[in-house]
């Protein structure tokens, strides 16, 4: 028995040697009986929109699939786009939440952005959308 995706040609990012940021997310059909998908990275970086200083953080993405699942390489390269962009922690959580919701149309999606301390304050922003 195999888990091979029959239409793998549709996953162009996964099959490529792309090593630069991308703005699109790729998907594949959700397998039966998967109730929650969770991604975590401790490598989220962006730029403070006021000072231009780098911001570092941890990002957790959770969603309940409807018909589609998110392909992880395209997610990694999508998150890379924020390295050179200025965003507040809250705006970044909101933007990522909306992008995933618009792409997957899941039953719900929650994005938790935990920004590392700056000025002695750690910021956590949680974005949430449900159908």
Which residues make up each language-model segment?
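N-terminal intrinsically disordered, cationic/polar leader segments
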Residues: 1-131
């Amino acid at each position: 028995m195999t888990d091979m995706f029959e239409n793998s040609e549709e996953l162009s990012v996964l099959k490529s040697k792309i090593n630069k940021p991308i703005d699109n997310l790729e998907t594949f059909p959700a397998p039966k009986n998967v109730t929650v998908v969770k991604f975590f990275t401790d490598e989220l970086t962006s730029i403070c929109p006021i000072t231009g200083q780098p911001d570092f953080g941890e990002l957790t993405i959770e969603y309940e699939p409807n018909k589609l699942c998110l392909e992880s390489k395209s997610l990694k390269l999508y998150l890379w786009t924020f390295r050179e962009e200025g965003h507040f922690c809250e705006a970044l959580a909101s933007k990522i939440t909306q992008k995933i919701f618009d792409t997957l149309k899941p039953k719900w999606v929650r994005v938790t952005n935990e920004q590392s301390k700056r000025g002695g304050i750690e910021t956590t922003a949680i974005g949430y959308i449900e159908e």
